[in-house]
From Swiss-Prot:
Biological role stated in the UniProt entry: Catalyzes the reversible isomerization of glucose-6-phosphate to fructose-6-phosphate.
Family named by the database record: Belongs to the GPI family.
HAMAP family: G6P_isomerase (MF_00473)
Active site residues of this protein: 287, 308, 422
Alphabetized UniProt keyword annotations: Cytoplasm, Gluconeogenesis, Glycolysis, Isomerase
UniProt GO molecular function: carbohydrate derivative binding; glucose-6-phosphate isomerase activity; monosaccharide binding
Organism annotation: Bacteroides thetaiotaomicron (strain ATCC 29148 / DSM 2079 / JCM 5827 / CCUG 10774 / NCTC 10582 / VPI-5482 / E50)
Subcellular location: Cytoplasm
Transmembrane segments: none
Stated name of the protein: Glucose-6-phosphate isomerase
InterPro entries: G6P_Isomerase, Phosphoglucose_isomerase_CS, SIS_dom_sf, SIS_PGI_1, SIS_PGI_2
Isomerase listed as a keyword: yes
Organism ancestry: Bacteria, Pseudomonadati, Bacteroidota, Bacteroidia, Bacteroidales
Gene giving rise to this polypeptide: pgi
UniProt catalytic activity: alpha-D-glucose 6-phosphate = beta-D-fructose 6-phosphate
Amino acid sequence: MISLNIEKTFGFISKEKVSAYEAEVKAAQEMLEKGTGEGNDFLGWLHLPSSISKEHLADLNATAKVLRDNCEVVIVAGIGGSYLGARAVIEALSNSFTWLQDKKTAPVMIYAGHNISEDYLYELTEYLKDKKFGVINISKSGTTTETALAFRLLKKQCEDQRGKETAKKVIVAVTDAKKGAARVTADKEGYKTFIIPDNVGGRFSVLTPVGLLPIAVAGFDIDKLVAGAADMEKACGSDVPFAENPAAIYAATRNELYRQGKKIEILVNFCPKLHYVSEWWKQLYGESEGKDNKGIFPASVDFSTDLHSMGQWIQEGERSIFETVISLDKVDHKLEVPFDEANLDGLNFLAGKRVDEVNKMAELGTQLAHVDGGVPNMRIVLPELSEYNIGGLLYFFEKACGISGYLLGVNPFNQPGVEAYKKNMFALLNKPGYEEESKAIQAKL
């Protein structure tokens, strides 16, 4: 299970200040548990891990097997929370070069519907021309522009290449239980469907079929993922004392740093496989907290790569930042630095050391340098990359986000600002019903 260390923040805020949040955190947790806070229609994620049945997981695994048995490639069509959670888990657990391996134990997973790039979609459809592919269409409404557009293209291509009957078997819809374009299409075509619960918002949906089905198709153990999340649900429960509750401490610490003028949180990893965990985290916290002219800005870096781009700014730029480092305790493989007789690169002092030891010293050295440079640091230790640990990490961030949003004084479960660009886009595209908006926006151009 993960652990949290906040000691490297105490040169900037006091332990007593963090402890003083206990009453506020308790109130926030009660709002979550009793459903008395804003956004209480979207609390289905709170006890989701412990409520997922074995039968539900078996159904997901059976459907995943159908896709694995009948597809070389599976396209996950979704945007935001409809794909980021799945991608975060899949990329964290996959071999870095799965794409290039000749022997594959699961279909190649590709993502679509998360942009409107014509080149991306054209190149994807070209790649799929000689492939046995399937699609997981993830959309509660079925009318989200990016995803609906991609699915329209992929549905037609799948039917043209594989025939309607096979397409019916290898297209799965994850959507609303009763309504929406995706539900209507799925019922009409006879697709296998899974339900997105009404009370779970997209960015909190990784432990619903939204995330679990693609993760299972990719060959990973969703039973263990859910078990890790369920254990973290207990560890972060409202009955756990404040000082022992990692989600409570993380939420309190980041809010105290925010109140002390630290407006930007940078999520740091020293393992490139965690890149999409950071992308998922940015949406989770950005959409949950960025409203009412408030909110910590969530940013991320992949070290040591980004030490050669963002390192200068972090070390000596404006002191409005703090870092949360995901530290990986144990890696999967072992590789030692070889001895070289010529030693032209001067690296013989590392000969015989594991590459991971070099990476860990880079991590420690970076943390010390950044703290000395005025950047508070929190550290989340992940024992190893496994389904169980990743499940726990995701739930930890979700629970802390709910608490943190209420500490901040916002509704953590809505995202009204996301609609602004859509209204402008629809007006510019002359979508029926947007005539007045179209006139108004044309006057601005």
